Amino acid sequence: MSASSTPRPVMLVILDGFGWREDESDNAVRLANTPTFDTLWATSPHAFLKTSGEDVGLPDGQMGNSEVGHLNIGAGRVVMQELPRISRSARDGSLAQNPALLEFIAALKASGGTCHLMGLISPGGVHAHQDHVVALTKIVSAAGVPVAVHIFSDGRDTAPRSGEDFIGKFLKELPDSVQIATLSGRYYAMDRDRRWERVALAVEAIRDAKGPHAKDALSALQASYASDKGDEFVLPTVLGDYAGMKDGDGILACNFRADRIRQLLDVLVLPDFTEYDSGRKVKFAAVCGMSRYSDHLAPYMSILFPKVPLDDLLGDVVAKAGRTQLRMAETEKYPHVTYFLNGGREVQFDGEERILVPSPKVATYDLQPEMSAPELTDKAVAAIESGKFDMIVLNFANPDMVGHTGSLSAAIKACETVDQGLGRINDAIVKAGGVLLVTADHGNCETMRDPVTGGAHTSHTLNVVPVILAHARGETIHDGRLADLAPTMLALMGVKQPDAMTGVSLLESA
């Protein structure tokens, strides 16, 4: 099929966190007034995609997430994720022989410094896993290096107040010699939206031992609960007699997902950090991370688990075919339609343009469930009408980001806002003679109440997600998984699917 005979643009709209569940109870997707989605569902070919577990390269039963989802979408194949890879290394003993870890330990033994081991302590498995942190702590401690642990509490990929149980379990598994130094809610330590005032509080506690004090982690957690702040929002707290970082110490960052650990490390590690006046710079003997976090951090730290390179990605194949493409999102999901969709690489392909709309500056998105969807929609419609692009990928962040707040009413509003945007985009696609694929990367806001605890449900789900193919004449689609989206888009564009893409086009005619 020649480029001139294919529909243009082929547009993928990702409704982030918009999963499928038949039961309407506490289901923002079903309770929302979504006339555009409903009409497209009723009048267009549709199916379901699997977004969790082994279908996206995770352990069986592990919920998907935005990073994993976009990696699989962009790769057009199931991508083995860091979680099972690292877990296997910890189980079989190879982690203790990891060359980067051995070099890190040697540097600290030579300097006489402390290993500041930091990360999300949670069984959630989205950004980190506490079992990995336990394994690393035991290895470093057994080598004779003092260890100070900086706990980031979850409450987002886990129930909002579940930290007391699994942090308690984590503490019992650590060697007696380990110091528990600080406790910070991920709202502060793992911000990714350049809210430097949040990050600064975590930095002051971790680096300088400044901030509220508590005798131990569980006391700090209980005090936070007493002030009606769940795990995610624990104010960065200094524990026991922790006195801060000193020259010759080292950092071992245990998050394997990059997007929410980068900012904290930027402040602590980068010698030329200028986003705010962050105070003193510690001269670290070594800095090591679980994975590659960014190009600008890479010169200053080693990596335990380098990414397995991916070739022939969706964006790469489209560029090599001489086609144009556009990636669009607001701040919260911009890395996903760029960095993660491009295989975890900070590369911009020939003919690839990008549009970033700033996310609103609010404490939590239930306060503004519309987020920046209206502005993003304006730019999407203009891009479609421009006729410049063969492929457009757009992410609406609202269902996921508002779903994480646990507010059902706000999540309903988020879904309704996105549907309004989808309506305008659909109209523009029809006028342009294009094709529209609508789907999600994982579930979230279709389950807003925890069926076990009865409390708010703020994490992702294992549910399938819908996929709709609109305005592709004569085509029908079948069920699949996220890895099948890239082959589908290439088929719609008349571009040959490379052998490296092992996903299967959803088109029945393919």
Curated annotation (Swiss-Prot):
InterPro entries: Alkaline_phosphatase_core_sf, BPG-indep_PGM_N, Metalloenzyme, PGAM_B_sf, Pgm_bpd_ind. Mn(2+) 2 binds at residues 16, 66, 441-442. It catalyses: (2R)-2-phosphoglycerate = (2R)-3-phosphoglycerate. Pfam families: iPGM_N, Metalloenzyme. Binds 2 manganese ions per subunit. Pathway: Carbohydrate degradation; glycolysis; pyruvate from D-glyceraldehyde 3-phosphate: step 3/5. One of its GO terms (molecular function) is manganese ion binding. It comes from the Bacteria. Substrate binds at residues 127, 156-157, 186, 192, 257-260, 333. Its cofactor is Mn(2+). Signal peptide: none annotated. The active site is at residue 66. Its EC number is 5.4.2.12. Mn(2+) 1 binds at residues 400, 404, 460. GO terms for cellular component: cytoplasm. Keywords: Glycolysis, Isomerase, Manganese, Metal-binding. GO terms for biological process: glucose catabolic process; glycolytic process. Catalyzes the interconversion of 2-phosphoglycerate and 3-phosphoglycerate. Belongs to the BPG-independent phosphoglycerate mutase family. HAMAP family: GpmI. Monomer. PANTHER family: 2,3-BISPHOSPHOGLYCERATE-INDEPENDENT PHOSPHOGLYCERATE MUTASE. This is 2,3-bisphosphoglycerate-independent phosphoglycerate mutase. The gene is gpmI.
